[in-house]
């Protein structure tokens, strides 16, 4: 029997707990997390709740009740949970997502054998474009050839705008289950992705054209965030927090200009979804949120993982490709991106991101081949961009 007031969430990480679990848990749902961290699993099962610390002008806290957890290594229990849950959510990142979807498929198949009339909706709380098709293909590969995936499984893409900083180790030692987050609490998701009625949850914001909103998140929010980190680090490598570099008017104005250039592109690409004034207001709000001192978001966290953030379909190149498609200027976006090739920020313990160090060394060895072989740039389609980046790379620390 399906429990319509239960959500199973793959990933008891920062977004899973501070956002998805919090929205559903505080709306009367039973929340079941699937995770690999034994400390988190044991803690959730013991306390049956956890605390979300809201960081802002006035600190607040939310206690999320009615919570439990299952180890991702307990395949049978995970399949059973999937088969009986009212709705699923995943927040694990692309690499892990690829590994868990086959288990979800097994749960879907079991569910269908018990109750073929009750479809399963899966909220894809991932920062990736085309997440629904990515998951759909893996489901198809792991279900019987005649399984009605498109009729029985709803794949709901999202635009995750909530900012969640790294929690200091001293805080985790005192309270392992706590998560920090900003007050922003709107989950934008695909209204057309649901097979069952959309849950009546405060904070859900269904949209009819989710692609536009996913691109807005990537090409304004993520783009601006990374721009502030990369340019801020270039000018102020000694600083730790994002709000600190945004106190420099030069960093602030350049970040805003880059975001506005991307807004121009988005308005051209999605005229039925956005106006420039809408996006300008969104940018102003985002910059205020980026400057939230209480959040203590580090330059390291915002800029780290260069291979992903400078990749061929992420925040910079994705917006550049859209600009190329509509013959729109993207020079500021390109310049902002170029600062990322010199980003060497370290965490508060003085440690860098391991894969970033390897990537930066590969750039020094052969810049152009690193763009094509590691970041996935197309040597033909992206040739004009590659040529400009080569020129910018030869001028390290150039000031805008």
Region spans (language model):
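Substrate/ligand-engaging "lid" and interaction regions
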Residues: 2-8, 14-400
